[in-house]
Amino acid sequence: MKLKCVEVYEGLYHQEPFDVAFCPYRISPLGAHIDHQYGKINGLAIDKGIHMAYHPKQNGIIELQSLNFPKRAQFFVNAVPEEKQGDWADHLRGAAKMLGEKYRLKIGLSGVIEGSLPIGGLSSSASVIICFLSALCKVNDIHLEPMELILTAKAAENQYVGVSCGKLDQSCEVLSKKNHLLYLDTKDDSYELIPTSQSMKPYKIAIFFSGLERSLKNSKYNLRQDECKAAAYALMGYAGMDYGTFADTRLRDVPYEVFEAYKDHLPELWRRRAEHYYSEFARAEKGAEFWRKGDLEGYGQLVFESGKSSIYSYECGCDELKKLYEIMRNTDGIYGGRFSGAGFKGCCMALVDPEKVEDIKVKVTEEYLKAFPELEGRYSAYVCESADGVRL
């Protein structure tokens, strides 16, 4: 079946696209909100994501249209505006700018972008950047190693868009392997792909969209990171540890024993952010061992605990997402679930029993729309599987 982005491209340009780039979305069952503090994470790429039908343009112009957003974007590949423009294409301007700082870009492209799921919670921003970068590299005959691709995509969000994300999203979308759990240390970028044990019960990945799309640019995402940094900086000061600049401080720099000794000196909000970090770090480590042993029930329980910590210690999540989380906790056949992504609107993810998928979708949908009837037609549910990361 022909992709919608291909159909639209052919209608606009009266030719077939040169190629179709793809980057998967991701879920991160464990490791929420700690990648920017150099924590450890668990992740999986899924078989839904961003497609872009494209064709090279020798004149160096980038011309893009999204099926998810209005207005076409256009700019020169070697003359990206210094300041973001405030629209959906800022992520791609940032990607071109970051790539152009290391490589000579001469060839542009025309492209039509299509996301296969609603926006919010599955790292669509990282996916579209990586999808675009893979196409831009191909037409300019540039080869990026996986970690270089990850860091270029991250820099586009950090330095151009202005979102202080860590590298969780990009790493999951690049490094993942089907039927494996990515176990990544975001401090030194070491990682392991843990195969799904033959003894593990089968599972599917369910995605429940709240009906509320989110943008990190207008959320408390960056504030939460500042609170984590502030907690780390204060703890280092109380303990008499050597410390550098505030910008370069992370909770990973502070041993748990120091937190235990001085946590009562912290403002309550900073203490709770740190509590989430240390408990989530431990869950990510324990989760990797559960996955290795094939203990899906144990792993799922950790995912539920992660969701609870995100609500009460990290304090993210709107009423709608909290309701979805509550419903998931009380639904037979769901091994574990939590907010997906930052948790500011968007969606929830769950690891579910394949034999109970339809019953789960019915129960979650009925209970959620009973609580929020105004979201009927905007709420949606999907079932996915693990997938390989992007391949250049």
State each model region's role.
Residues 33-35, 44-46, 281:
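A short catalytic or substrate-binding loop motif that flags glycine-/basic-rich loops and adjacent residues
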Residues 344:
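Glycine-rich phosphate-binding loop
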